[in-house]
């Protein structure tokens, strides 16, 4: 009996000990699970998020910018974060130097229609002092001046209040654009894409207000007869019927391959597009001018995570290879600066030069029927932090850009009017123009050279660095500084301030 009682107590004690151990183990597992949940807590946004900033920026082309811009994001329950369910972008601004006005409203969503992506926007730009640099980039000017292109051409031909009163590269344009693009799924990461764009252009001489340039009470305008815009019309390089602008109805269709982990600032993945963009009608109804065209466009973007595990996040090496070329017809003068994109990341996508393509060049400095370019940059996050319940990070992006013309614009007409491949404007050396009163004088012996076909195939290169401040991984403020290595294209220190990475 005694042995039985001892055995019973032993079994009861063992059971109690086992139960206590199970409770202790469960408690420990609960604590560990709580710790792990805390450790694995990640950024998440739900509902609406707003980003708005004043457009207090500066650019060499347009001067100081005043106005506001921003993005509106809707994340819903946060399950798609950092990608929003819906994104609305907008801007309203004015530039002091070029007197440009910009108004922009855009919508982008992958979730409005299941299985499809919708991108649509409205844009209006008024440019009373738009700069037209000529055709075919490096060929459109020559370094045959006493000093660099920067120190001579820009001050003399762009400054008001000097004698002569000339802005040689000046003209005006107003642009209205409405676009809508749709993408649908074909297979994993592979989409079809199609869209339609409507453009309306109004071109003219400069619309500059008369000013008292010399302080004597006499108000004057720039000399509208001494401009490259007028010279190209006289030579037939800008055709009769298109010199006042026109309308274009473009359609595009192609394929998109996308494996990016985050759209606004990918850490890894590929984003590639191949499509055709054409205008069955591009003309001016009032003049009867019509010049339909078809372009082929290929873009390849690759984002490579560098796993060195720094606290702010791994650096990313990103590069873009791009090519677009007219393969049928001829692009009208008022459309030649356009770079068609399936997904419009910025308000304006124009020209071989400036923030959209080759940083370090003046805006729309290269105009050609075919262009190829490459952009490379290293995106390095310096620090991330949380402020006002928003997630921020600070990053830098040193970069190198390069490009080349693959198909010149209207080279056949240029060959006919040029002498040994060179084109001159003798008005620039006329005795009727008193250069002696200008702040910076043209070099003695300058012969008025404005085009040299031998430079068409020159490789264009630039380099610089950017600074990024990102909120919730989507609203990204960008400031970039660059310098062009080509003497005849160098416009001094280039500054670009806006939103988003370039690609």
Predicted regions and their residues:
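Membrane-embedded beta-strand positions of outer-membrane beta-barrel proteins
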Residues: 52-54, 88-92, 118-122, 192-194, ...
């Amino acid at each position: 009996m005694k042995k039985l009682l001892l055995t019973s107590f032993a079994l009861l004690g063992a059971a109690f000990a086992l139960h206590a151990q199970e409770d202790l183990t469960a408690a420990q597992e609960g604590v560990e699970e709580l710790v792990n949940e805390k450790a694995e807590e990640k950024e998440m946004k739900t509902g609406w998020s707003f980003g708005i900033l004043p457009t207090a920026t500066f650019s060499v082309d347009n001067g100081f910018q005043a106005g506001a811009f921003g993005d509106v994001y809707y994340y819903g329950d946060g399950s798609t974060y950092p990608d929003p369910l819906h994104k609305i972008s907008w801007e309203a601004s004015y530039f002091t130097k070029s007197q440009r006005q910009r108004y922009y409203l855009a919508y982008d969503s992958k979730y409005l229609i299941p299985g499809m992506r919708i991108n649509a926007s409205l844009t209006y730009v008024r440019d009373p002092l738009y700069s037209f640099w000529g055709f075919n980039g490096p060929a459109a000017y020559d370094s045959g001046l006493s000093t660099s292109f920067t120190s001579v051409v820009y001050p003399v031909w762009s400054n008001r209040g000097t004698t002569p009163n000339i802005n040689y590269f000046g003209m005006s344009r107003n642009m209205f654009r409405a676009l809508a693009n749709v993408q649908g799924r074909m297979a994993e990461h592979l989409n079809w894409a199609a869209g339609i764009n409507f453009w309306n252009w109004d071109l003219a001489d400069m619309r500059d207000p008369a000013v008292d340039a010399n302080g004597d009470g006499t108000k004057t305008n720039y000399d509208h007869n001494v401009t490259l815009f007028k010279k190209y019309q006289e030579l037939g390089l800008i055709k009769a019927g298109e010199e006042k602008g026109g309308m274009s109805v473009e359609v595009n269709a192609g394929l998109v391959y996308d494996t990016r982990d985050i759209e606004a600032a990918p850490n890894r993945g590929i984003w590639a597009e191949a499509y055709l963009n054409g205008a069955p009608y591009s003309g001016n109804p009032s003049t009867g001018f019509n010049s339909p065209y078809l372009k082929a466009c290929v873009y390849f973007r690759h984002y490579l995570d560098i796993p060195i595990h720094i606290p702010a996040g791994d650096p990313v090496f990103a590069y873009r290879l791009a090519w677009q070329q007219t393969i049928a017809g001829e692009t009208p003068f008022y459309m030649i600066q356009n770079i068609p994109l399936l997904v419009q990341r910025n308000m304006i996508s124009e020209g071989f030069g400036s923030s959209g393509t080759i940083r370090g060049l003046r805006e729309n400095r290269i105009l050609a029927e075919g262009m190829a370019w490459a952009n490379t940059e290293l995106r390095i996050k310096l620090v991330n932090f949380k402020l006002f319940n928003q997630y921020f990070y600070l990053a830098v992006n040193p970069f190198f850009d390069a490009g080349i013309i693959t198909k010149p614009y209207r080279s056949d007409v240029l060959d006919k009017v040029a002498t040994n491949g060179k084109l001159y404007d003798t008005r620039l050396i006329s005795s009727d123009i008193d250069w002696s009163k200008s702040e910076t004088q043209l070099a003695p012996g300058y012969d008025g050279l404005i085009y040299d076909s031998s430079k068409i195939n020159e490789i264009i290169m630039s380099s610089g660095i950017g600074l990024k401040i990102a909120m919730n991984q989507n609203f990204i403020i960008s400031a970039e500084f660059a310098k062009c290595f080509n003497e005849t294209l160098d416009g001094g220190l280039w500054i670009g301030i806006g939103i988003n990475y370039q690609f």
